[in-house]
Amino acid sequence: MHFRLNFIPEDQNEHHVFRQKQKEAFGGGEAPVMSVEEALRLVPNLSQFNADEDDEEFDAEGFYSTKLSELSCLTAGADGLSGRGLEVCYEDGAYNVCIGTPSTRADWRIALEYLKNLALKMDGEITSEDGEKFSAQNIEGFDFESDIRAGLANIKRNLEEKAVMCTIYGVRNEVSFDQKIIARIMDAPDPADEFSKFVTDIQNLNAYFSDQMFSGINEDSEIIGRYILPQDIATVLPFEPSVDYNNLQILGGKEVSRWSVAIFGGDEDHCEKYDILATLKYENFIQNLPKDKYE
């Protein structure tokens, strides 16, 4: 079974954390920790994005019965609506709900509804990371619009000062920004709406997002990063390759010396005849793409 986390660490990405203490059990002590299934029931039509349920190794009964205290974090959202979703974890007798900065308007509305229902279920106050208190009656009035504006301004500033590309993580796919994209968002009549649409559309693309593969990791040689491009399948590749956050630990701090694209294909009626047809330098492949194939 494969799990993923969508938010990058605090030193690389800002986020808001809201804390809700666990309810006391009747007669004293803490009530049982919610399972994944119970946590998802707090908001209608909420789905998990930790695991691929189409994976033949996915154990639905085992996963949904898992207590949040046994899971590093539950990534949740509304399929088709969420851009970045929210993360729920349990530690030190409390539920922590994390929302990335910036997140989409739909993400925030779902997260605030989640916090409201969590507060009702736990019959207690919600506390933000800066100590501000909220109740189930007023949490939905949290000013998330200013948080979206601040997050977009931070991306813009990073691109202007040092970064060639800024990347955030969505419920399904990464979202990258360069100066052209962030300028289009910031110049829109409603930047938060433009950002929300951009991020959510990328999560709902009917395309294969190419996975990264690496060679030379366990050898005393250069590390080569590779993207797989299948024949006859709509595939999304980054304009400029960089190591996905989920792969940083695999590399153990080592740098990728070069990137390539491996074109994979063969006879669709005979899977055993599929093979790598060609391997190209990444920059050469991108430079030779027709202009209508990328923005």
Name what the model sees in each region:
Residues 1-295:
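Acidic (Asp/Glu-rich) sequence patches and key acidic residues
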